[in-house]
């Protein structure tokens, strides 16, 4: 790979990192071609972009964006790495868990950047999968706002029924 090709890849990765709210780093080494194709199709169906990139190019892209990536320098940026880009924080984590349920251990979660916070290690995958999306949070707020009104309506209906029985 020439320096020009590397510079283009660094620029692409930097743009994707800057444009996405979330990126995950995975290890897909040892996956068969069929497994990689199935994983890419699943990513595409969920709106997640998956790209295999050399660790040195990932580091240079992060440096270009002035992002302190020291938390990722350990296990996250060692070995083969694939990047997953998403605007929803929990979708890549849920996608990885769903793919693993099919009996495939790879790709392994190595680390993630969610809204500029770094999460490194396999033990963080469950926590990332449990993060609620914007739509889920809005649904929870609407349900909380509707609950008092439903209680008032229920109370009024009950009182009118009691009043009708007495009359």
UniProtKB/Swiss-Prot annotation:
PROSITE patterns documented for this protein: RIBOSOMAL_L10
Entries under InterPro entries matching the protein: Ribosomal_uL10, Ribosomal_uL10-like_sf, Ribosomal_uL10_bac, Ribosomal_uL10_bac_type, Ribosomal_uL10_CS_bac
GO cellular component, one term: large ribosomal subunit
GO biological process: translation
Record keywords: Ribonucleoprotein, Ribosomal protein, RNA-binding, rRNA-binding
CDD domains: Ribosomal_L10 (cd05797)
GO molecular function, one term: large ribosomal subunit rRNA binding
HAMAP family (alphabetical): Ribosomal_uL10 (MF_00362)
Function as written in the Swiss-Prot or TrEMBL entry: Forms part of the ribosomal stalk, playing a central role in the interaction of the ribosome with GTP-bound translation factors.
Assembly behavior: Part of the ribosomal stalk of the 50S ribosomal subunit. The N-terminus interacts with L11 and the large rRNA to form the base of the stalk. The C-terminus forms an elongated spine to which L12 dimers bind in a sequential fashion forming a multimeric L10(L12)X complex.
Cited PANTHER family: 39S RIBOSOMAL PROTEIN L10, MITOCHONDRIAL
Family: Belongs to the universal ribosomal protein uL10 family.
Protein name: Large ribosomal subunit protein uL10
């Amino acid at each position: 790979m020439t320096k020009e090709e590397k510079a283009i890849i660094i620029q692409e990765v930097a743009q994707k990192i800057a444009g996405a709210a979330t990126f995950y780093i995975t290890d897909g080494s040892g996956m068969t071609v069929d497994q990689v194709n199935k994983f890419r199709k699943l990513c595409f169906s969920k709106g997640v972009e998956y790209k295999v990139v050399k660790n040195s190019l990932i580091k240079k892209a992060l440096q270009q964006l002035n992002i302190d990536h020291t938390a990722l320098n350990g296990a996250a940026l060692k070995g083969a790495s694939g990047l997953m880009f998403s605007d929803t924080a929990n979708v890549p984590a849920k996608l990885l868990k769903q793919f693993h349920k099919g009996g495939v251990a790879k790709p392994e979660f190595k680390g993630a950047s969610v809204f500029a916070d770094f999460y490194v290690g396999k033990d963080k995958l469950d926590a990332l999968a449990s993060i609620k999306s914007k739509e889920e949070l809005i649904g929870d707020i609407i349900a909380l706002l509707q609950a008092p009104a439903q209680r008032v309506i229920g109370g009024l209906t009950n009182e009118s029924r009691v009043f009708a029985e007495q009359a």
